[in-house]
Curated annotation (Swiss-Prot):
Chain ranges passing through the membrane: 71-91
Residue ranges the record marks as coiled coil: none
Organism: Arabidopsis thaliana (Mouse-ear cress)
Protein name as catalogued: Endoglucanase 21
One Pfam family, short name: Glyco_hydro_9
Protein family: Belongs to the glycosyl hydrolase 9 (cellulase E) family.
Active site: D166 (nucleophile), H514, D561, E570
GO cellular component, one term: plasma membrane
Length: 620
C-alpha cells in the first residue's frame, strides 16, 4: 500500500505495522502480567538502574569553619599562582647583574665643614668629654680655673674654650662664636644632619653654654657682676709673672694661678652678647625643655644687666681692650634683644629692637667704612638680617613694619656692597674681598660675609622672591651665592698660592700654625719659658690642629707659613665659627633643602596687628 509523502513522492507502508492503538494497549497489559510480583533485591535493582548521581557539596569543612567551595578553590588557586609568579620574579632578579647605587660623595663644602668643626674640640678647656670627636693630643687642662682666689664670686670656672693660639678664655668673642654656631644650626639643621654633624655641633654649643652659666649667677633675676675673662696676656714691663702670653706651653701643663677678670658694671656689650648666645642656644635645645628654660632665664638676667648700667666692657684701659676692644655696645643690645624675642616671643623685646632710637644708636643709619662688616665687634649686619627674617616670613605689620622695612633695605645695601660692581671694598688680585680694608687677619671677616650672603639668598628664595635691588639694578639670588662661593673657595685653596687656609683640608695647608698646644709634642712637658724653643722652631707642628682657619693672607695674596707671625697663622674661635656657618649654608644638594623657616619662630605667638592711629584731621 502506498501513501503520499507530504514532502513529495510515494511512501510505502508495511501492512503488518498497521495495528490499532487498542491492539498495542492489550499487548502492554499482557507484558505487565508476566512481570514477577516479588520485590527485587539490590543486585537486581542495580542491573536495571543506572549509577546513582551524588549531589556535590557547596561548602568545604575546614574543621573550625565552613567555607564556600568556590571561594576556597579561588583562594587556593590565587595562592598557587602568586607563589609561582614570585618564584619566577625572584629567579629573574637573582640572575640579573646587580648595580649597587652608592650615595654620591660629599661635596667640598661638606668635607670642609666636618674638618672645621674639629677645631672647636681642639680648643676645649677643662675635663674633656670622652667621645669620638676627641683630639688625640689634647687632654684635661686648667681644672683649677676660678678656684684659687678667695675674692672671686664664682669658684668653678672650669670649661669653655681657649680663644686662639694661647690658653685665655675671652668670654666676649667666645659668646659670639657660640651664637654663630647656634644660628647656623637653627637655619640649617637638615644640612648638618645630612653631613652627619648635627649632634657634634650641638655638643660643641652646649660645651660653651654650660660654661657661660658658671660665669654669673644664672639662677638670679638680677646680677651685679659677671666674669669677662679667665687667664691673662699682659706683656711688657711688670709682666714677668707667669701668664698665658709670657709662657709658651701646652694648656695641659699649666701650673700657675690663672687670673679671673670680672665686670661689676658697664658690661652692656659683654652681657648682651652672652645673652644672645644663651637665647639662640635655647632654640637649638628647645626639645630639652628644662635646659632650654634655664638658658632663657640666664639670657633674660644678662640682658637686664646689660640695660641697667650702659657702657663698654673694655673701657678704662682694661686688659680686654688690648685683645678684644669693643667699639660700642648698642649693636649688642640690638642683637641680643632680637635673639631674646625669638627665644621668648615677648613683644617687649621686639618693641625695643624696632625702635628708631635704638637702631640709630647702633649705627643702622650710618655709612662708615666698616658698615656691613660683620664680626665679633660689629653685630649690626647680623641683627639687621635677623630682623629682616621676621619681615619676610611673619609680616607683623604696624607698629613694627616701618623699622623692619628699614632693616630689610639696609640688609639689601650691605649685600650690594659685597658685589664687585660697586667697589665699596677692594679685592686682591686673587679675588679676596678686603672687608677690613687691607688690615691683617682678613679671613674671619670674609667668612662672616659669605655666611650672611648665602643666608640672605636662602631667605629670599624661601619667601619666593627672586632677588633684590641695588638702586635701579635688579640682581637675582644667584649673585649672592656666587659671591659666597667665590670667597669660601678662595679660603679652601682657589687662590694664587693654591693653598688651603684650613688645616687638614686639601693637599696644601699651613703647617706652622701659631698655637701652643699644636707646636709642642704631646709627650713633652715644658716649663713656662722652655717651650719657646718650639715656637721658634723651623719645623712643622708635631700636632695638626685640623679644622683651624688661620688668619690669612695679606692684601697682595701673600702668605708666610711662620709660627712666630700670628697675623698670618693664628686661628680664632670667632673666625672658625663664621667659617662653619658659611660652609653649612653652601653645603649639600638642593634636595636637602634650604633654611628651616619655622624653628626660629617656635616660641613666637601669633602677632595681633595693632590698629594704626587715625590720620590727622583734614583742614583746607
Amino acid at each position: 500500500m502506498y501513501g503520499r509523502d507530504p514532502w513529495g513522492g510515494p511512501l510505502e507502508i508495511n501492512a503488518a505495522d498497521s495495528m490499532t492503538d487498542d491492539d498495542r494497549s492489550r499487548n502492554l497489559q499482557d507484558l505487565d502480567r508476566a512481570t514477577p510480583s516479588r520485590p527485587l533485591d539490590e543486585t537486581q535493582q542495580s542491573w536495571l538502574l543506572g549509577p546513582k548521581v551524588l549531589k556535590k557539596k557547596k561548602y568545604v569543612d575546614l574543621g573550625c569553619i565552613l567555607v564556600s567551595r568556590k571561594i576556597f578553590l579561588w583562594t587556593l588557586g590565587t595562592i598557587v599562582v602568586t607563589a609561582l609568579l614570585s618564584g619566577f620574579i625572584t629567579l629573574i632578579v637573582k640572575t640579573l647583574p646587580h648595580h649597587h647605587h652608592k650615595e654620591p660623595p660629599p661635596d667640598n663644602y661638606t668635607i670642609a665643614l666636618r674638618t672645621a668643626l674639629k677645631f672647636f674640640n681642639a680648643q676645649q678647656s677643662g675635663k674633656l668629654p670622652k667621645n669620638i670627636y676627641n683630639v688625640s693630643w689634647r687632654h684635661d687642662s686648667c681644672l683649677q680655673d676660678g678656684k684659687g682666689d678667695p675674692g672671686q664670686c664664682y669658684k668653678d670656672l672650669v670649661g669653655g674654650y681657649y680663644d686662639a693660639g694661647d690658653s685665655i678664655k675671652f668670654n666676649f668673642p667666645m659668646s659670639y662664636a657660640m651664637t654663630m654656631l647656634s644660628w647656623s644650626v637653627i637655619e640649617y639643621s637638615a644640612k648638618y644632619q645630612a653631613a652627619g654633624e648635627l649632634e657634634h655641633v650641638k655638643e660643641l654649643i652646649k660645651w660653651g653654654t654650660d660654661y657661660f652659666l658658671k660665669t654669673f649667677n644664672s639662677s638670679a633675676d638680677n646680677i651685679y657682676v659677671m666674669v669677662e675673662q679667665v687667664g691673662s696676656g699682659v706683656s711688657g714691663r711688670g709682666s714677668e709673672l707667669h701668664n698665658d702670653h709670657y709662657c709658651w706651653m701646652r694648656p695641659e701643663d699649666i701650673h700657675y694661678k690663672r687670673t679671673v677678670s670680672q665686670c661689676y658694671s658697664s658690661c652692656s656689650d659683654l652681657a648682651a652678647e652672652m645673652a644672645a648666645a644663651l637665647a639662640s642656644a635655647s632654640i637649638v635645645f628647645k626639645d630639652n625643655r628644662l635646659y632650654s628654660k634655664n638658658l632663657v632665664h640666664g639670657a633674660k638676667t644678662l640682658y637686664r644687666f646689660a640695660t641697667t648700667s650702659r657702657n663698654r666692657y673694655s673701657q678704662n684701659g682694661k686688659e680686654s681692650s688690648k685683645f678684644y676692644n669693643s667699639s660700642m655696645f648698642e649693636d649688642e643690645l640690638l642683637w641680643g634683644g632680637a635673639w631674646l624675642y625669638y627665644a621668648t616671643g615677648n613683644v617687649t623685646y621686639l618693641e625695643r629692637v624696632t625702635s628708631h632710637h635704638m637702631a640709630e644708636k647702633a649705627g643702622a643709619f650710618g655709612n662708615s667704612p666698616y658698615y656691613g662688616v660683620f664680626s665679633w665687634d660689629n653685630k649690626l649686619p647680623g641683627a639687621q638680617l635677623l630682623l629682616t627674617r621676621m619681615r619676610l616670613f611673619l609680616s607683623p605689620g604696624y607698629p613694627y613694619e616701618d623699622m623692619l622695612s628699614e632693616f630689610h633695605n639696609q640688609t639689601g645695601r650691605v649685600m650690594c656692597s659685597y658685589l664687585p660692581y660697586y667697589k665699596k671694598f677692594n679685592r686682591t688680585n686673587g679675588g679676596l674681598i678686603q672687608l677690613n680694608h687691607g688690615a691683617p687677619q682678613p679671613l674671619q671677616y670674609v667668612a662672616n660675609a659669605a655666611f650672611l650672603a648665602a643666608l640672605f639668598s636662602d631667605y629670599l628664595e624661601a619667601a619666593d622672591t627672586p632677588g633684590w635691588y641695588c638702586g635701579p639694578n635688579f640682581y637675582t639670588t644667584e649673585f649672592l651665592r656666587n659671591f659666597s662661593r667665590s670667597q669660601i673657595d678662595y679660603i679652601l685653596g682657589k687662590n694664587p698660592r693654591k693653598m688651603s687656609y684650613v688645616v687638614g683640608y686639601g693637599q696644601r695647608y699651613p703647617k706652622q700654625v701659631h698655637h701652643r698646644g699644636a707646636s709642642i709634642p704631646k709627650n713633652m712637658k715644658e716649663t713656662c719659658t722652655g717651650g719657646f724653643k718650639w715656637k721658634k722652631s723651623k719645623k712643622n707642628n708635631p700636632n695638626a690642629i685640623n679644622g683651624a682657619m688661620v688668619a690669612g693672607p695679606d692684601k697682595h695674596d701673600g702668605f708666610h707659613d711662620i709660627r712666630t707671625n700670628y697675623n698670618y697663622t693664628e686661628p680664632t674661635l670667632a673666625g672658625n665659627a663664621g667659617l662653619v656657618a658659611a660652609l653649612v649654608a653652601l653645603s649639600g644638594e638642593k634636595a636637602v633643602g634650604g633654611i628651616d623657616k619655622n624653628t626660629m619662630f617656635s616660641a613666637v605667638p601669633p602677632l595681633v596687628m595693632a590698629t594704626p592711629p587715625p590720620p590727622a584731621p583734614w583742614t583746607p
